[in-house]
Each structure stands twice: as structure tokens, then as C-alpha cells.
Amino acid sequence: MAHPSQLGFQDAASPVMEELLHFHDHALMIVFLISTLVLYIIVAMVSTKLTNKYXLDSQEIEVIWTXLPAVI
């Protein structure tokens, strides 16, 4: 039964819907892991002190291009 403040799908009424729920959960976990990896790489690249300052000219726009779709 669905509730007004529910964040996920309602209970499955058929075996196909149960499989769809499992697929959704699996896909969401993969998307979460990829987003976490990208965030870690961005933070590591921005916060490191071992890089050349002149090589980072276009890195800010690349961070925006990567982070903006994840936020949206």
C-alpha cells in the first residue's frame, strides 16, 4: 500500500513488479557507487598539492561539467 510520504515504490502485486523493484534497487546502487567514485576523484584532484598549477587551467570547467549533471 502506498503512503503519501513514501520515498520508494509501493508493494509489488505481481512477480514481474517484484523483479522490476529488484532491478531498480540494483541499478540505484550502481549509480550511487559511480557517483561516489566520481566525487572522490574530483575531491582528490582539487585538493592535491602535488600537481602543477598551470596544468589545471581547464580543470574547473571539467569539474563543473561532471558535477552539474550529478546535482541535476
From Swiss-Prot:
Membrane-spanning ranges: 15-45
Positions in the Mitochondrial intermembrane compartment: 1-14
Subcellular location: Mitochondrion inner membrane
Positions in coiled-coil regions: none
Swiss-Prot/TrEMBL catalytic activity: 4 Fe(II)-[cytochrome c] + O2 + 8 H(+)(in) = 4 Fe(III)-[cytochrome c] + 2 H2O + 4 H(+)(out)
GO BP, sorted A to Z: ATP synthesis coupled electron transport
PROSITE patterns recorded: COX2_TM
One function term, GO molecular function aspect: cytochrome-c oxidase activity
Keyword check for Transmembrane helix: yes
GO cellular component: a single term: respiratory chain complex IV
InterPro entries xref list: CcO_II, Cyt_c_oxidase_su2_TM_dom, Cyt_c_oxidase_su2_TM_sf
Main localization (coarse): mitochondrion
EC supergroup of this enzyme: translocase
Mitochondrial matrix compartment segments: 46-72
Subunit structure, as described in the record: Component of the cytochrome c oxidase (complex IV, CIV), a multisubunit enzyme composed of 14 subunits. The complex is composed of a catalytic core of 3 subunits MT-CO1, MT-CO2 and MT-CO3, encoded in the mitochondrial DNA, and 11 supernumerary subunits COX4I, COX5A, COX5B, COX6A, COX6B, COX6C, COX7A, COX7B, COX7C, COX8 and NDUFA4, which are encoded in the nuclear genome.
Name of the protein: Cytochrome c oxidase subunit 2
Source organism (scientific name): Gomphosus varius (Bird wrasse)
Taxonomic lineage of the native organism: Eukaryota, Metazoa, Chordata, Craniata, Vertebrata
Gene (UniProt): mt-co2
